[in-house]
Amino acid sequence: MRRIILCLSIILITSLAFAQNFNSFRNLSTGGALQGEVEKAFDPVDLYSLNGIHLFSGLSNLSANDKIFANDGESYFLLGAASDKVFIKNLKGSLFFKFSDVQSPKAITYNPGIGTTPLTGEGQVHSKWEMYKDTNNNDLYDRYESKTMTLKNSEEKQKMDLFLVLSHKLRDDLVMGYRFGYINAGESKNAARQEMQLADMDSHSYDIVTILKNLQDFDPIISQYEKTNREKGDFSTENTSNKIQNQIAAMLDREKWDLSIYLRNEYGTDKDITDDKASSYEEELSADYYIDKNENFILKDEYKGMINQLFGRFRYKFLETKRFRYPGNLALGLGFRHSFFKSNYTEDTIYEHDDIDFLDDRYTRIATDKYSYDADANGLGFMGNVVLTYPLNDRTMLGVGMFCDINKVKREGDYAFSYDAETSSFTDVSDWQYSTIAYQYEKGDITLEDISSTLSVPVGLEYWFTNNMKWAMRFGSMFKRTMKIEKSLHEPTLITPRTVQDEWADGSVDITHLPYVSELENLSNTKVINSTDLSYGICYQANKNLKIELLGMFEKGNTELWNTDFIQSLKLSFSLKFD
């Protein structure tokens, strides 16, 4: 199951590449029904309708996740601008640069099982527990126990977004535009990808040393005894991705309508690498006894691919007059998407066991489990929308729309699975007794298919009040219905028997062929999700240069209006404009 879910998640990520990274508070507070300056600045042809110089910084809160009064945010550096003065006649441009580098300590909880309270903390916790005992009741300490624990749980994220948009008016009714985008992202964490010895899935890294020994210096009559146990889990997962976008657009702009064509190309690479190690070592020095177990899980998932999209939009205008603050329009859009990418996936689990007991008998075991596939994927997608933006009067703007997106991606390729194990037994460490070798191999064709459809219906309302019309209330809702169908199929073309070969010291050999049940899962499921999100906000047009906006006034479960939690949850945006 783990392999299939991972494969399908990459398909979903690829099909949704380059979702918009910045949004205006007008758009967010009306459920996506009404657009603001930021949406226009990102559109290669609508950019030309912006006038003046618009400046964006960290105070603009374009991610809508910063809570200024709580001093809580995404810790990013943001610099952006949109201008109609680009030193070339009839050319307008916008530039956005966003960078973040965040190291986040994660929660740690561990019960050492020694009668003490569980260890708790964040990031890294180091603790040492010690105990002295008198086991023979002669009023002298003769037994020492200690447990030293180092626990780590952290996450690091880096991301850089760069967007350049240019819009040029070729003639009175024709605008050409271009947008370039580059996103580089990286993420690393030290949480286990699967169960390994002491660790469950998503457990944090650990290093635990337990010592138990007799204290002959404290009590000379006690016998010599010393035992050491070390449990260690060192987990590492890193994900890096790079995406480049190029988009060209053209708009034929007439008095009552306009027609726009967008052609977009996206190229991306993604690499996911996991190297998880878990080990346990137990040694009793006085008896020359030890057990050494090591487990290593290595996963590499890489893909590179391309998405090409063609989209057209027809927009009928409700002519702007002095009566309305914003013009209205009815927009119809239809698009087509094709995606192609190559993927390579490998997953190896290596297990080693070395054991010497009190009689110098030795037992060793090495087992390897490998799975891999190479596949090519092709995808087709269709999208369409209809959006009505209508001024009900000189103070009220209504926005309502419907968006539909259907996407299908099919991946086909070859897979291989192998299992190898070797076990040996010795007496007196070097006197070989027997060995057991087990092996099995399977290969075949793999087909992974993902079908997704999303229907979104936003409704938004904006009302300007007070005599000077400097204040506006905004309300919005977004209904979304998402259906996902996931399928996977392994069709073996070769399966060798799972063979067990026993070889004894007298030279005899026994070979057994065991029944084999494939560990590779075939999957087919359908998931339907319905959701409705409500949004709201306030806008204050302080003057022609400064606009202050608020988003998300009330948090869920917060029934009190003016309290500390309410104030700290406010999300504000400051927008600057110069003529």
Q: Can you say where each PLM-predicted feature lies in the sequence?
A:
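Sec-dependent N-terminal signal peptides
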Residues: I4-T14
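N-terminal, post-signal peptide beta-strand-biased segments of exported outer-membrane/organellar beta-barrel
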Residues: S15-T117
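Outer-membrane beta-barrel architecture
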Residues: N27, Y48-F56, L78-A82, N90-S94, D161-S167, D173-G177, Q247-M251, ...
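Transmembrane beta-barrel strands of outer-membrane/channel proteins
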Residues: L55-N61, L95-F99, Y178-N184, S223, ...
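Outer-membrane beta-barrel strand-turn architecture
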Residues: S83-K89, H168-D172, M251-K256, Y316-Y326, ...
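Extracellular/periplasm-exposed beta-strand and loop segments of Gram-negative cell-envelope proteins
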Residues: K106-G113, S127-K159, N184-Q245, R264-F311, ...
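Outer-membrane beta-barrel "beta-signal"
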Residues: Y540-A542, F566-D579
